[in-house]
Structures are given as C-alpha cells and as structure tokens.
C-alpha cells in the first residue's frame, strides 16, 4: 500500500521542520517538501509530530504464567498504540526463560500473538531466583536481547 503523510513535523538537527513522507509497503521511500507521490491513502499531518518507532527495553508481558495480569497480545497491542515498534520482555515468567525449552514456550507465544517486534530476555539464574546456578547464557545468547533477573539482585 502507498501512503503519503503530508506536512508532518520532524525534528531535524534540533529544529522542527514540516515534511512529507512517502511510504510504500510499510517502508519510507521518500522524504521532502510538497512531494508528488500517488498514494492510496493521504493523511494531513499538520499539527502532528512524526517519529520513527520507539523502543522500550523494559516491559512486562507476563506470558507464560501470568496471563491474568497481561498477555503478549494485549501488551504488544498497547505498545503499538503508544508508538512502540520494538520491546524487550522481562523474564519474570513461569516457567522462567532459563533454558532452551523454557525460552521456546515464550518464543512460540511471541510468534503467535505479538503485533510488534518483541525480544525476550532470559533469566540470569535458574528459576530467576537471583542466586544459585546460572543459566547457560552461551546457549541462549543468540535468541535473547539480554539477561536479567528483573528485580532480584544476583
């Protein structure tokens, strides 16, 4: 789909500037003033600031294990509504993402439910207890954004 955002405000080198953004299939393909871009949808963005997607490196999506508090579907939708396109989900889950098998449970939920890019953390310690045996960080590092025991000192 081709979309044109007209006269939005962008912050450029410390100054606000009015620009048009041409978007094709979700990708910005042109930026400038008074762009000619045949589009299926045109939005008048005067009075609105245009920003790239935001990133939040500390969110609680609560699945698996605590879906009565939040789910990946509801949490990621709320993040998208606020302009966040990428979030990093804390590991205070049940089971804690402390092994390949436990992380796979969370990854399957993310794959099936998230409406934005959700990157999981793995826990530092087994069971996210803040003490005792460490997780196999080398085995998990390629699948997570980092390691945390979220709220528990190690």
Where do the PLM segments sit?
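Divalent metal-coordination and catalytic microenvironments
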Residues: 8, 26, 47, 58, ...
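Short coil/turn connectors at secondary-structure junctions
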Residues: 1, 38-40, 46, 50, ...
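Redox-cofactor binding/interface segments in oxidoreductases and associated redox assembly factors
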Residues: 44, 89, 149
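Histidine/acidic-residue-rich, glycine-tolerant segments that coordinate divalent metal ions
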Residues: 93-104, 109-154
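Histidine-rich, glycine-flanked metal-binding segment
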Residues: 1-53
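Metal-associated gating/positioning segment near the N- to mid-region
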Residues: 48-113
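Short, glycine/acidic-enriched loop or turn micro-motifs at the edges of active sites
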Residues: 27, 59-61, 152
